[in-house]
Amino acid sequence: VPKKEKPVIHPVSEKSVPEKEKSVIHPVSKVSKAPEIAQINPSPYAFGDLPDNRLLPVRGHSRMNYTVKWAKKTKKHIDIASMAGILRLTPMTPEVIRVSFVKGVTTEIKDTYWKPEATDVFSWSVRESKTALKVSTEKVSAVIDKKTGAIQFETADGTVLLKERSVEPRLIMDQQTWEFFEWDSSEKINAKGILSTDLLVLRAKAKYISFGGKPMRMPLVLSRKGYGLGIAAKETVLLCNIKTYGPYISTLGEDQIDYYFIYGETNEETISMYKKLTL
């Protein structure tokens, strides 16, 4: 009886498999991130709201000592200590200086919702005399009086733009802050609304300049002298330009004073620089 031939099994080459039968492995696509939801300012006050006059006087307190005890410069900022707390100046650009203050010498200065430090390299310096510390960029200087701790902002040629009050220039108390400025009596002060053309008049007035109930936006004060103040606060911000009570800029829900001095020379340039402080 003839033996049955064993079936020969040939290995199947990749080429012999029809295209339709090939298993195709598709790369797994990354899960797309949901769009970020803008943080809302929780303040109950809308931009331009009038405050209750009973809230305008600064509450009674023991006067703090802001005399400069020591200063320490790093590559990014300078810390200036007093018995009241730590004042930090952070040059952001040649035209912008961030000013931060916390109560107590052991308290850490925190980042805010906005840009914390410079992202581009540029030259800045600190000069010390018997009476003052001078932090300078190519465009602007901040001069700190050693006796009072108050800051005076100047142009490169020494023209004074803005002064903090010499007696107790700033104050933090029970989650509320006050930053006292000495605006000239003839100086026109405005707060920028949502639109660049929406300017709130603040001469001899007190108004809320934060955007309660709206997506997070930094309040911006504009002066006809060519500078602006960006207030890095996430809740209520009140500007009181009434001499009986201030003048001051106050925040609620904050335990750190934080603002940007912006010297754009014109409102348009100042607003452009302000927009670049958003992360």
Role assignments for model-derived ranges:
Residues 81-82, 125-279:
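Catalytic and substrate-binding clefts that recognize carbohydrates or anionic sugar/phosphate headgroups
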Residues 4, 20, 35, 42-45, ...:
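N-terminal functional modules and adjacent low-complexity/disordered segments of proteins
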Residues 86, 96, 150:
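Exposed beta-strand and adjacent loop surfaces of beta-rich binding modules
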Residues 37-71, 75, 90-133, 169-174:
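A low-complexity, Ser/Thr/Gly/Pro-enriched, surface-exposed linker/loop concept
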Residues 77-89:
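Mature N-terminal segment immediately following signal peptide/propeptide cleavage
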Residues 11, 27, 42, 50-53, ...:
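Short linear motifs in intrinsically disordered/low-complexity regions
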Residues 2-29:
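Long, intrinsically disordered low-complexity tandem-repeat segments
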